[in-house]
UniProtKB/Swiss-Prot annotation:
Sorted UniProt keywords: Cell cycle, Cell division, Centromere, Chromosome, Coiled coil, Kinetochore, Meiosis, Mitosis, Nucleus
GO-annotated cellular components: Ndc80 complex; nucleus
Major location category of this protein: nucleus
The organism of origin for this protein: Drosophila erecta
Any one GO biological process: meiotic spindle organization
Subcellular location, record wording: Nucleus; Chromosome, Centromere, Kinetochore
Tagged with keyword Transcription: no
Domain of life from the UniProt record: Eukaryota
Keyword Cell inner membrane: no
Coiled-coil residues: 41-119
Protein name in UniProt: Kinetochore protein Spc25
């Protein structure tokens, strides 16, 4: 009787241990599932954090690029403002120079015109500016007691011999040839400056040089 009870008690203990093992295995399985789920969630969180970090780094890179671009633009605008200011100053200085040059040119032109008027009155000579620079055309008036004598002239500006002959003829009539030559030269200069061709014709350039040579050479 005692032996039967002992076996029954043993079986109960074995059964209890078995059931406990079953519960432990069940709990272990649940725990493993929870650990796996936790690891899966943790992995998802890590991946999400990595993606977020990549986005943050990308945004930081964009922000840095935008900041550098903005700094470059600010620097460029500063340089541009300096260049604009420098250009304004240069333009003002240029306007002042042009104004001074125009004023000096007007003064010089007034002096020349006054000189031409004086020489024209002194020599009694009128030079047709429309004919210049190709031709030296005009008239010299010799004042007389009874009547005035008109001496018209119309020569090719390159006709050095004709100009010399005219100078000799005027000199024989007691005309101040030196002043006459100065008058023609001044009128020639004023006319050519007024027309101011960008590329002076070859004939005009030659005619001016010949007249200058003729006017500076002594007359007999």
């Amino acid at each position: 009787m005692a032996i039967i009870m002992a076996e029954s008690s043993y079986e109960r203990r074995v059964k209890a241990l078995y059931e406990k093992q079953i519960r432990m295995e069940t709990l272990e399985g649940k725990f493993i599932k929870k650990v796996f789920k936790f690891n899966s969630i943790l992995l998802d969180v890590k991946e999400a954090a990595a993606r977020h970090q990549r986005k943050v780094e990308k945004m930081q890179k964009v922000v840095i690029e935008r900041r550098e671009e903005l700094e470059k633009r600010v620097s460029f605008m500063g340089q541009l403002a300096q260049e604009v200011e420098a250009t304004k100053l240069r333009n003002l200085a240029m306007k002042d120079r042009i104004k001074q040059q125009k004023m000096l040119a007007r003064e010089r032109n007034n002096e020349i015109m006054e000189r031409i008027h004086t020489l024209s009155k002194t020599t009694g000579t009128y030079v047709n500016q429309e004919a210049l620079p190709a031709r030296v055309k005009g008239v010299t008036v010799l004042r007389g007691d009874k009547r005035d004598q008109l001496i018209p002239f119309d020569l090719n500006a390159t006709d050095a011999e004709g100009l010399n002959s005219l100078c000799q003829h005027l000199e024989s009539l007691n005309v101040d040839v030196s002043q006459w030559q100065q008058l023609v030269s001044l009128v020639m200069d004023v006319t050519m400056e007024a027309r101011a061709p960008t590329t002076p014709p070859k004939e005009a350039a030659n005619c001016k040089s010949i007249i200058e040579i003729d006017l500076t050479s002594p007359t007999s």
